Design a protein with these regions (language model features):
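A cross-family phosphate/adenosyl-ligand binding-site feature
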Residues: 1-64, 71-160, 164-198
Length: 198
């Protein structure tokens, strides 16, 4: 569909002369492996670089995100959990799997998060310069209520859209955002601490 060659062979001689895994690693702003099987997690955690994906990841200097997806029993296996802990210690970001109906027919933890939620991880990492890093920001959004007496209150018709947009952009620019929100019909902003007040 893209017109680009899909690179799977580490040393494909029918392609341009480049050490592909190194050149791909240099081009990347971030890397996300989704879904990440127990096998690929184990290889990376233990420094095994025997295919195009693992050699590229080993050569990366950018942020690497791993999204485990597998059967619940495999995910909960102590060896897999130890490999995930090792990846975190090495600085990889491991995205927690969702719970739900799995491809094997079981129900439980190990489901890959939705593509939309994985996209937010990439956007958070690459969308904007992090010129608001180390800034703590509190944003208010939506309607509020001020009681007049035990029965009546004063409120407004705020939709919260502007406050949510500000919180989203500040998060993408690296700020640590707390969003104090009244009741709104706006989707929650990922990676933002939301405090509901109504």
């Amino acid at each position: 569909l893209t017109g680009n060659k899909c690179i799977v062979d580490t040393f494909d001689r029918n392609f341009q002369f480049n050490v592909e895994h190194v050149s791909l690693a240099k081009k990347a702003d971030c890397v996300m492996i989704a879904p990440a099987s127990a096998n690929i997690i184990g290889k990376i955690a233990n420094g095994i670089a025997d295919d195009m994906l693992t050699t590229t990841v080993m050569a990366c200097k950018c942020k690497v995100m791993i999204s485990p997806a597998m059967n619940t029993n495999m995910y909960d296996n102590p060896i897999v959990q130890d490999n995930i802990a090792r990846l975190r210690r090495f600085g990889y970001e491991v995205i927690e799997p969702d719970s739900g109906y799995l491809a094997c027919g079981d129900t439980g933890r190990g489901k890959m998060p939705s593509p939309e939620s994985l996209l937010w991880y990439i956007l958070k990492e690459t969308a904007y310069e992090k010129d608001m890093k180390d800034i703590k920001l509190c944003v208010t959004a939506g309607p509020t209520r001020e009681a007049i007496d035990p029965v009546r209150f004063i409120s407004n018709n705020s939709t919260g859209k502007m406050g949510y947009a500000i919180a989203r952009m500040a998060m993408l620019r690296g700020a640590d955002v707390t969003l104090v929100s009244g009741k709104v019909d706006v989707p929650p902003v990922p990676f933002v601490n939301i405090i509901n007040v109504i």
